[in-house]
């Protein structure tokens, strides 16, 4: 996967326009470490609290399909999500965001309704993460993100804000056009 990230970054592979744009600082640093062979792929991501952009969250969705079709247990899903996220974003806050998102997608792949999928991710075991980290996702895991007003949803590059916005939009719109154009 890290090799493919490098192909994307260096050669614009997998892009719609044959141009790379808006690569985050954390992703850039991680890919540089990997390219210079300074670390194993899963150890290249920064793990400080200031390295919690949404880069790994934006790339993690294919892992949901893999885990679903392999019928993996939650502990194995967390391990894979952690390893893939850690290529660029190794902090537990970003890993948890990716895990929540992957689990939500898996619930949808199982045929659950949006509401049931959302309720099911709130019931998962998050004890592999500190209470402080889990509490950063309080509006998703302990409250109901879909009930917030649009003005209360932030649109930033911070992983928590991005996941909140993603779930809010998905839970509050019915069509693609409504979600994108709003």
Regions found by a protein language model. Give the residues of each.
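Structured, active/binding-site neighborhoods that engage oxygen-rich ligands
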Residues: 1-182
């Amino acid at each position: 996967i890290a090799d493919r990230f490098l192909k994307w970054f260096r050669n614009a592979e997998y892009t719609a326009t044959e141009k790379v744009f808006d690569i985050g600082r954390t992703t850039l640093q991680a890919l540089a470490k990997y390219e210079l062979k300074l670390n194993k792929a899963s150890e290249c991501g920064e793990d400080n609290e200031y390295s919690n952009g949404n880069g790994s969250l934006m790339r993690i969705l294919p892992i949901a399909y893999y885990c679903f079709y392999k019928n993996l247990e939650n502990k194995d899903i967390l391990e894979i999500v952690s390893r893939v996220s850690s290529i660029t974003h190794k902090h537990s806050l970003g890993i948890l965001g990716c895990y929540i998102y992957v689990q939500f997608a898996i619930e949808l792949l199982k045929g659950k309704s949006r509401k049931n999928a959302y309720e099911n991710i709130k019931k998962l075991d998050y004890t592999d993460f500190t209470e402080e980290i889990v509490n950063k996702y309080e509006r998703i895991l302990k409250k109901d993100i879909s009930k917030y007003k649009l003005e209360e949803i932030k649109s930033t590059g911070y992983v928590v804000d991005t996941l909140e916005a993603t779930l809010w939009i998905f839970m509050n719109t019915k069509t693609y056009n409504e979600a994108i154009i709003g």
